[in-house]
A protein has these predicted regions:
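Alpha-helical catalytic/interaction cores of small GTPase-regulatory modules
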Residues: 1-141
Length: 141
């Protein structure tokens, strides 16, 4: 599990009681986000920069940036077409069964990270609809 993922998700989840409207939709201050990323790139020991900020929008932006910069996307280039095809299946039961099987087929590192992040999204969407609407989750992943 990448430390940046567990750290950012943990900070976001710890702030769910506050007004976190548009956690993954609203852009954070780009300059601050870049400063935090630079510190983290120097050493994950500098991850305290995120914890000190306690700003969910910065954490969400750092997390989105991390996923965008992966050399092989979380849902892998190889399996991506199958995920897209599965998303178009009308029958809920069939669609979920196929998507679960595709997630299981992910490489181990991707599987663990995807499982953790999807659980995080479930926590957020289940906590308060203003934080992340369930119908919008597919946009972010």
């Amino acid at each position: 599990m990448p430390k940046v993922v567990s750290l950012c998700c943990g900070i976001i989840e710890s702030q769910l009681e506050t007004d976190c409207h548009g956690i993954y939709r609203t852009a954070a201050n780009e300059r601050i986000k870049n400063e935090v990323e630079e510190e983290m790139n120097k050493s994950m020991e500098n991850a305290h920069a995120l914890e000190q900020l306690r700003d969910v929008k910065i954490c969400a932006s750092v997390l989105k940036s991390f996923f965008r910069q992966l050399p092989d996307p979380l849902f892998t280039d190889k399996l991506y077409p199958a995920f897209i095809e599965a998303a178009g299946i009308a029958d809920d039961v069939t669609r979920l069964k196929i998507i679960r099987n595709l997630i299981i087929d992910l490489p181990q590192y991707h599987y663990g990270t995807a499982k953790f992040f999807l659980h995080h999204l479930k926590k957020i969407s289940g906590h308060d609809l203003k934080n992340l609407e369930k119908k919008s989750i597919k946009i972010y992943i």
